[in-house]
Amino acid sequence: EDNGQAIYKMVLDYGNVKVSGVDKDTYTVHAKTSTEGKRPADETAYGDKDQDRTIVRVEEKGTKVEIYFDENDGAAGTLSYLATGARNIPVDIEYTVTQNTPVKVSAMDGTDLGEDTFVYSCTNTVEDEETAKFTSVKVDNGINYQYYDAGDADSLIVWFHGNGEGDYKGSQNNVAQLLANRGTVAWATDEAQEIFGKAHVMSFQAPDTWYYAQKDGLLEKAYNEIQEVISKKGIDPKKVYVSGCSAGGYMTTRMLIKYPNLFKAAM
C-alpha cells in the first residue's frame, strides 16, 4: 500500500528539562490540513481534515517526547486530492498540542522539579529524510522537476508521474510528484542506487497533464532539459533510463517513440 507521505510522528522538545511519566493519554494532538485558497471554494478536497490524531504510543527521550500516530487515522497526509480537479495539491498544516495531565519534570542533573503543565507551539514543519534528498528545480517556460544529485554518478533515471500529480492551475508546486507516492523517492533509496550503481534522478511535474504532451510541446522540453542535465552533470548518454506510471507511462511511451535512441532502457 502506498498512500504517499504521511505524518507518523511528532517530537516535543522541552529544552533544558527532562520529562517523564507520559503515556498516550497525556496529550491530545489536533491536526488541521487545508487547501483553502488554493482551489475553488466549492471544490471537494478529500485530504482537508480537521480532527484529532490517533496516538498509538509515546516515547520519552530525555528532554524530548516522541508521539507516534496511526498513519491510517485519516489525517496523516500532506496532500489533498481534488474531486473534480483530479489533482493532489499540498495542504497547509496546523497542529495543536494540548497536555491533558501534568508530567514529571527534572533538571539535567536529575534534580526533581515536581510536576508541570506546559503550553505548546508547533513549527508545523515536516521533516522527511527521503524527500530531503531532492532539490526543486523550476524552469522558465519549461517543465519543473525534482532532482536527486548522485554525486559523481554517470547514470540518469527519468521519472514521469501519474495524472494526479500534475500541477494545478499554474501553482508550480513541484512537490506533488514527490509526495503522492513512492514513484519519485524510490529511485534514490539505497536499494535502487545499489542496483543502478548510483544514478541521478529527474522527476518531472507536468504543467497540467502528460496527455497533451505533443500539443503542448512537452516532449521537446523534456528532451532539452534531460540533455542539459547530461551535459552539466557529466552523465554518460548511453546510461539514461526512463520510467513512468499511468499518464506517466503514456509520456514515457511518447518519449520513446520520438527519441528512440535517448534511453538505454525503459521501465
Region locations from a protein language model:
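Active-site machinery of serine-nucleophile hydrolases
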Residues: 154-156, 160-221
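A short beta-turn/strand-edge loop motif at beta-sheet boundaries
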Residues: 16-24
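Active-site-proximal beta-strand/loop segments in catalytic clefts of secreted hydrolases
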Residues: 159-163, 204-207, 243-247, 252, ...
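Short glycine-enriched nucleophile-adjacent loop
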Residues: 249-261
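Gly/Ser-rich "nucleophile elbow"/oxyanion-hole loop immediately N-terminal to the catalytic nucleophile
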Residues: 210-246, 262
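A domain-start/cap signature at the N-terminus of enzymes
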Residues: 1-9, 32-154
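Extracellular/periplasmic catalytic domains that process cell-envelope and extracellular macromolecules
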Residues: 138, 150-153, 193-197, 235, ...
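A conserved short beta-strand
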Residues: 261-267
